[in-house]
Amino acid sequence: MEGEIYQSLILGYPNIISYETTKTIIDQMEQNICKINIGNYQGTGFFCEIPFPDKNNMLPVFITNNHIINEKILYDENPEIEIEIKFDGIKKLNLKDRYKYTNKEYDITIIEIKITDEITNFLQLDDNIINNIINNENKNEVYINKTLYIIQYPGGNLSVSYGTLENIIKEEKGTFFHKCSTKGGSSGSPILNLNNKIIGIHRQGLNNNSNKGTFLNFPIKEFIELNYPDYNLRQYNKKYGKYLDSLSCEKINIIYGKLGDEGFKHLCELKFTNLKEMTIPNIGITSIKPLEQMKLDKLEVLGLCDNIIPDITPLSKVNMKELKLLDLSSMNISDISVFEKVNFEKLEKLNFGYNNISDISVLEKVNFKELKELDFHNNFISDIKVLENVHFEKLEILNFNMNKITDINILDNVQFKFLRQLLLNNNNISDVKKFNKVKFRKLEKLELKNNNLSYEQIKYIFANLKSKFFK
């Protein structure tokens, strides 16, 4: 039956070889190719591995045309596509939280494949294409007049077509003409050489029996640059690093990029001598040990929030004597005892929000002479008695929102003469008998919402406190 279906497809397409000849190729490749269903429209896509960012780190991806999966589909609020793989049937891929890239000029879309997708068969790029990507070269002339083939889903059925690469269109970056016969549904098919390695993707059939394709090295390089924040640093250091004595950069700001531990290690190996700010939230790192090798004696701002780094002990081995702002929020931290060993005498703002901290006894052992803002919101702190022995003479904002505090009477022994804001919302506070003795003469804002306090207790507090005003 398959042979009959196949023969009915090839009428009028002389470069499509016989069913018997192609069956071996189809049997080998059918798990690497898939049919894409977008409404009533069908196309082809394929699975392959690409350097990310080099040969030592290959990333499995899914590739098709931009005119099949475009920006609207890719970045939809709930992006999902339906693909059909022979023997595996129909799979639905949710495209959220993946590396992805699409480009109308190249007519290509590249999407990361994850382990949970349960796709295990991947085509390989031709070595010349990989070298072009890694070395930023364009040596694609070697494919001119070479025999190629496409494995595709014309009319929704798997087939193979042979042809040659005619020429490269210099006016359209990465574009070439090929003679492999195609039909409706072939869009997004891989173009391979006789070594079964991919060189490009089929884009469009033309009226003159020629077809357009795109070399994969150009879009894959852009995919890496977009999704691997460390890529440009790697390329720069690879080319010039051995000649550099120092980098005078003052600011590093990588927002929500997936740098990862390997990329972070490489970043820390660069020779920064004048770095004043490093903000790297949610970049996928799990250790800050690489900071130990950096020269950070001029650093004033360090933001590490939204990375899962429970162990912050390496901070004790980093010289950051000029540090003024340290953001350690949302990092799964429970132990902050390392602060007994750090020397942050100029620190003004310290944020521990959204962690698992319950013990803050180390605060009586630290020397933060310039600290103005201390944030412990959303932790598991129940005992704040240590504040009696803390001397943060310049503290202006103290945030204990969303903790487990029950007793705040100890605050009558606390000397924060410049405190302007005291935030205690969403705790379990019930005892405020001694709170009328608190002497926060600069206090402007006191918040006690969502505690176990009666109206009379709250009235008692505000009636006895002599501050400027409360908001």
Predicted regions and their residues:
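Catalytic nucleophile loop of clan PA
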Residues: 46, 166, 181-203
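Protease-domain processing segments flanking chymotrypsin-fold serine proteases, especially trypsin-like
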Residues: 1-56
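A structural signal for leucine-rich repeat
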Residues: 264-271, 288-296, 312-320, 336-344, ...
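LRR N-terminal entry segment and analogous cap-like coil->beta motifs
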Residues: 232-287, 296, 300-305
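Conserved hydrophobic beta-strand positions in leucine-rich repeat
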Residues: 250-254, 275-281, 299-304, 323-328, ...
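C-terminal cap/linker of serine protease catalytic domains
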Residues: 203-232
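Serine endopeptidase catalytic core focused on the charge-relay Asp
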Residues: 27-42, 56-59, 63-175, 193-195, ...
